[in-house]
Amino acid sequence: MNAKTRDQFSVVKGLMQDPLVTEVVNACDAGREGELIFAYLYDLAGCRKPVLRLWISSLTTEAIRDGFDSLRDGRRMKPLEDAAKSRSEADWIVGMNATRAYSVRFGRPGNVLSVGRVQTPTLKLLVDREREIEDFKPEKFWTVYARFAREENTYDGVWFRKKENRLKEKEAAEAIAEKVRGGTGTVTKAQKKNASEKPPLLYDLTELQRNANARYGFTADRTLKAAQALYEERKLITYPRTSSRYLSKDMVGGLKKRVEAAGALPELAPFGEKLLEAGKLPISRRIVDDAKVTDHHAIIPTNKKSSGNLPPDEEKVYDLVSRRFLAVFFPDARFENTTVVTEVRDETFLSRGRVVLDAGWRALYPDGVGGRREKEPPVLPPIEVGQEWAVAKVAVKEGETKPPPRYSESALLGAMETAGKFVEDEELRQAMKDSGLGTPATRAATIERLISVGYLEREKKILVPTEKGRALIQLLGDSRISSPELTARWEERLAKMEHGSETRSDFMSDIGDFVRKLVDEARSKEGERVAAPAKRNGKRGAKSRRANGSGGASVDKPSGESLGDCPKCGSPVVGTQKAFGCSAWRESGCKFAIWKTVSGKRVSEAQAKQLLAKGRTGQLKGFKSKAGKPFSAALMLDGEYRVRLEFDNEP
C-alpha cells in the first residue's frame, strides 16, 4: 500500500465495512481503467456488498445528479473488469520479463533495456523513420514558371506535361524556358468549380494534444495536465481522456447552455451570439452519433462559464476546446476554385486560383487550425478560353526531393492512433481501428517514458531516437514485441472478453506461453551490448557535435561487417554503437574513427563508406551550428585522417 494513500484507503475500507452501509457506488472514471481501480480497492478492502455503477462524463452538479438517478448494476460491469485486469496484468508480465531478459542479455551494468507492448512499437516507428531519412538520396529537379500579362492583369503558371511538372535535367528546363520566352499564350482551359470544406470534428484527447502541439508547442503530457485541471478543478470541460469525437443524442437538449459558456470568452463572443441568434443549432451525424460514443463522448465545454482567471496553459486549452465546439455548428467553408491551362508554342502551363465565397467555420480560425496560416491559391483575374496572354516573364527554379520528416509529437500521436495501418492482417487491422497503440490517456506517458529511459530526445517539437533506442530496435529485429500486431491481437481478444465471448483464464494462459517464447528469443539472439546514452553536463542523451574522428571507436564492441579499409593501418572499419572505427584498435591502438553524429547530423553507413572510399562525401544537409541553425557541408578526411567539415567556398 502506498504510504501517501494508506490513510485514505483506511477511510474507504472502514466505510465499506460499516454495517450501516448496504451498497457501494463505484464512482471511478467511466471506462476500462476506472473499473480496474475500483476492483482492486474493492478486493483489497475485502468487501462483498452489492455494487452500483455511476457512469458520467462531466463533474458538474447537474451531471452528477443525473448520474445518480440512473445508476447501473455493478454485475453488468464484470466483463469490463475482466478485460481491464487482463490487459493490466498481461502488460506487467510481458514488460517485466522482456525488460529483464534483454537487460541481462544485452545491457551493460546499470543500463536497463526497457521493453513493453506499447512503448517498443512506438519507438520502432521513430527508428524506422530515422533509417528512411538516412537512406534517402536527394535528387535535384527543375521547374519552369511563366508569368502571363494582358492589359493590367497578370497570372502565373507552372509548366507541366502529362501530370508531371518536374524536369530531371537542367538543360531540358532551360530549353523550354527559352522556347516560350517572348511568346504568346493561348488559354485552352478555364474551368470554375465550387468546393466546400466541412468543419473539423470535435476533440478527443489525441486530437487535442496534436493541435496543442502544433499551435503552442505543448507536449502531450502538458496538454493532458491542463485538460485534467480544467475537468477536475475548474469543471469547465468534460472528461478529457476520451477516444470519441462525437456526442450522444441525449446531450442535444443541453448544447445551447454550452454554447453560451463557450461564447463567454471575449474572442469567441461574436460566434456564440451568432449561433444563439439563429435559434436551433444545426445537428448532424458529424456531431451526434450514438454508434460512435462508447465509454465517453467528445471533449466539449460544460455549461459553466470561465471566470477569465485561468493559468496560461489552461486558458489556451480551454480556448481550443471552446473554439472547436462552436466551429462544428458553423456552415461549411465554400470556395470557387479555378483551373487554367495556357499553351505557349506547344508547351502547357497550369494555373490555379481560389475565391472564398463563405468563410463558414474557418472564420473561427483566421490563422489556420494549426496556428499557421495555410497558403491559399491566389485570386486569378478574369480569364476566358481562347484569350491570348503575353509571356511577360519566364523563370527556371531548382529544387531537391526531400526525405520524410522526423516525427513531431503531434505526428507521433497521430501515428500511434492509426498504428493499425501497419498491420497486414485485415481482421487485426480492424481490431486496432478504434484503439491504436496505447489509449488517449496513456500515449503522453508512453512518450515521456521513452524519453526518461534514454530512447528518445526531444528537440523543440521534434522527437529523435538515441543510439540506445536504435540499438534496441536493431536487437529486437522482427520480434512480435516490436510490432503493433501484438496490440491488435490483444485488443481483438479483450473486446471479445468485454462482450463475454472470451475468458480471462484462456487469455492469461496464452500470455504465459508468449512470455516464455519471448524470453527464449532473447536468450538465442546475438548482438553487441548496448551502452547508456552519453552524458554531458550531468545529463543523459546529449548528442556529440564533434567532427574530429581521432578519438577512437573503443567505446563499444564492434559489429562484424566491414565498411572499408582503415586509411591509417589498412584494417577493416566496422560499426560500433557511436562510431565507424578501426577494428584493430585493441591490438594496434589505431584510433581512427568516424563518429556517427557530426554537428548534430547522423552519418549513415553509406556516407561512411563513401568517405572511406573517396576521402570525402558529397554536400550533405542537416548539420546544425551551436546556435541551432541548419547548414550544409561535405565530410572529408584531412592529412591526419581526421574527419572535418568542408564547405562549398573552401579551396
Label each residue range with its predicted role.
Residues 563, 579, 587:
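Residues immediately within or flanking Cys/His clusters that coordinate Zn2+
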